[in-house]
C-alpha cells in the first residue's frame, strides 16, 4: 500500500508540474503573439518623407519628384528659378517686386514702411 500511495503522490505531482508548465507555455505564446502585434503596428513619422513629392534638403539625399529646380510642387516654380512648364512660373524677381515698392511709374506710392520708396513722398519722409 505504501508503494501505491507514493506512486499516486508522484503521479499527482507530475500532473501538477505538467499543468503548470502548460500554463506557462500558454503565457509565453500569448506574450510572444502580443509582441508580434506590436511590431506589426508601428507609429509612422510625420510627415512621411517617402511620400513627399518634391525636393528635400541634401541631408536626406533628396526625394523623388524634385526635378523642377526650386520647387517641391510639380509644375510650379518660384520666382527666378525658371520652369520647364510655360505658363506656370511666376515672373522673375527682376521684373516684379514681391514686397512692395511698386513699379517705376508709381515710385512714391506703395511699398513697405522703411523701404526706399517711402522716402520719396514728403508725407512719408516727415514721419518718425
UniProtKB/Swiss-Prot annotation:
Residues 26-79, 99-128 are annotated as: Disordered. Enhanced expression in male flowers. Accumulates in the glumes and in anther walls, paleas and lemmas of mature florets. Sequence repeats lie at residues 64-67, 64-75, 69-72, 69-80, 74-77, 79-82, 81-92, 86-89, 91-94, 104-107, 113-116. Residues 64-116 are annotated as: 8 X 4 AA approximate repeats. InterPro entries: MFS18. Residues 52-68, 99-113 have a biased composition (Gly residues). Residues 1-25 form the signal peptide. Keywords: Repeat, Signal. Residues 69-79 have a biased composition (Low complexity). Residues 64-92 are annotated as: 3 X approximate tandem repeats. The keyword Repeat applies. Disulfide bonds: none annotated. This is MFS18 protein. It comes from Zea mays (Maize). The lineage of its organism: Eukaryota, Viridiplantae, Streptophyta, Embryophyta, Tracheophyta. The gene is MFS18.
Amino acid at each position: 500500500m505504501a508503494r501505491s500511495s507514493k506512486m499516486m503522490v508522484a503521479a499527482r505531482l507530475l500532473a501538477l508540474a505538467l499543468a503548470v508548465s502548460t500554463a506557462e507555455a500558454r503565457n509565453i505564446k500569448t506574450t510572444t503573439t502580443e509582441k508580434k502585434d506590436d511590431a506589426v503596428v508601428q507609429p509612422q513619422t510625420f510627415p512621411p518623407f517617402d511620400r513627399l513629392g518634391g525636393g528635400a534638403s541634401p541631408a536626406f539625399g533628396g526625394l523623388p519628384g524634385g526635378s523642377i529646380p526650386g520647387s517641391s510642387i510639380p509644375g510650379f516654380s518660384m520666382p527666378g528659378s525658371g520652369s520647364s512648364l510655360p505658363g506656370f512660373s511666376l515672373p522673375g524677381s527682376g521684373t516684379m517686386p514681391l514686397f512692395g515698392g511698386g513699379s517705376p511709374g508709381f515710385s512714391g506710392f506703395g511699398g513697405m514702411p522703411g523701404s526706399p520708396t517711402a522716402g520719396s513722398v514728403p508725407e512719408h519722409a516727415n514721419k518718425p
